[in-house]
Amino acid sequence: MKKLLLSLTLLVSCGAFAQEGPTMGWSSWNTFGVNISENIIKKQADAMVSKGLDKVGYKFINIDDGYFGGRDKTTGQLLIHPTRFPHGMKTVVDYIHGKGLKAGIYSDAGHNTCGNYYNGDVIAKGVGLYEHDQQDADFFFKELGFDFIKVDFCGGDGPQNSERLTLDEQERYTAISKAIENTGRTDVRLNVCRWDYPGTWVHDVAFSWRTTHDIYDGWASVKGILSENLYLTAYAYDGKFNDMDMLEVGRSMTAEEDKTHFGMWCFMNSPLLIGCDLTKIRTSALELLKNEDLIALNQDKLFYQPYVAKKLNGCYVLVRDIEELNGKRRAFAIYNPEDAQRHLKVNFADLQLGGSVSLRDAFAQAELGSFEESLDVTVPAHGTRIYIADAEERLERVRYEAECAYISDYQEIRNNQSERTGVYENADFCSNGAKAGWLGYSEKNDLIWKNVYVVNDGEYKLTIGYISGENRNITLHVNDAKIQTFSVNSGGWQTVGRRTINVQLQKGWNKVRLSNSSNWMPDIDYIEVVKVPTAVSPLSGASSEAGKDEIFLLNGLKMKKQNKSSKAIYIKDGKKYIN
């Protein structure tokens, strides 16, 4: 089985490709807070190189809050802290670049930083980007040469700044993005730190965006962040990424928890910013952070976040394509958030893998051999297993869960009911334990599957699993064409109904969209897509006498219909169809 490897050659000689992956590096905040210095930053850069982290893809040394020294009262020029960085910031940036690394910086979308409000860093008052967007962007990226910026929002969130200044997130981050663009730099990575998923607009202005509140060094934090990100699959695409926050690997969690933390951050295409002190990192943590199989998954050229394929015995089975869309090679993870070990059987058909399947253990970086039909596995409490799979066949996907679909107006900043924006909710009575709800009342509060793939064009049965205790309308669109509007009622808010409609799909990728522009839609559990069997006709000379079998041609194959029954059963692609 071919090893999944992110080699030095790939990282160094194919720089354009490497730059497209999630950001990999180190950030000062988790360990040092505002108590940073020129010496600390330089030592972390030294350690990144001496410990070989740069060789496996870690490139960024990011200076977070704590470097500010106020502003010049006449010119408004941003000043650097006189004692923490006595030689200014250009010296530090040049030092980082001299190591073959990239340099990152921090600011706030408002006047004041989070460190000013929460950490008593009084000198950091008025140092945010607000009213200085272009001046600071020119300073950071043209004069100093930084390559990355994380922009916080304490200064724009009234309860988190002394001015009680409240700003609009979309307006501020769009303006900041424009200021960076105006510098002429096209390689600067903007990270939006609004703590919850800010809205679908962020994809157009940033390279990555935070999806939760700050991580802390503890299992409860990691578990909570994973829970928040399981159903954000649809929002990471085209080389833009959901940011699950900096890494706490190598601090106080158990070895198994560290593996889950790092492994799932890699598997879910989150940026990888180490947060521990690299000069004191444990050997075991360093080895984990340098796992090339996991890093290769994180930096895979498709840059698609995995989706939850199955929930089994309290565990989540997530899967994604790697290297090639809809190919025979996939990766899957089994994540156990529970406080006890779990035994489960993963059926390869649920992962669209057919025939003999060869597996590689990404944590162990070892081949496991070939398996048929399923994998029996025990996952320890708080543990994760990640596999790279090569299958003989790629099966056609039938079910697409609603919690993996895209909501055009999705956001997590404001109350979704008052804003009339959809959400993803846990629901034990649904097929995979979750659903999409609070949909409708505008065309943008819709539900879209952009990745419905079929091998052949033609007529398909599209079944919608829905939940509604009253009559509600759905308008179905396929590939941007309106198909029909219909009313449904499942008879209760914990009962899943099914509505099937025949639609035409094109070979390859299709888009299925559900909407209701004037009222609430039902909650949605899933859609299923199944090919309608091609028309059949009796062979010349075949008997049609009652009680005799009739012989039919189906896709060039001889099939039998038993006349003693009023129904015919056809087998196509290993599936039964009744006519």
Predicted features along the sequence, with ranges:
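Glycan-recognition surfaces
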Residues: N182, D187-D277
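C-terminal tail/sorting-segment detector
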Residues: I569-N579
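Residue-level detector of functionally pivotal "anchor" positions at catalytic/ligand-binding pockets or at interdomain
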Residues: E396-Y400, V530-L557
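Aromatic-lined carbohydrate-binding/catalytic grooves of carbohydrate-active enzymes
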Residues: P22, I40, Q44, M48-N161
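Extracytoplasmic
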Residues: R342, L351-L359, E367, D376, ...
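Carbohydrate-binding surface patches
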Residues: W265-M268, L273-G275, K311-L353, H382, ...
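Glycan-recognition and catalytic regions of carbohydrate-active enzymes
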Residues: L273-E338, N416-G440, I448, G508
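Sec-dependent N-terminal signal peptides
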Residues: L4-S13
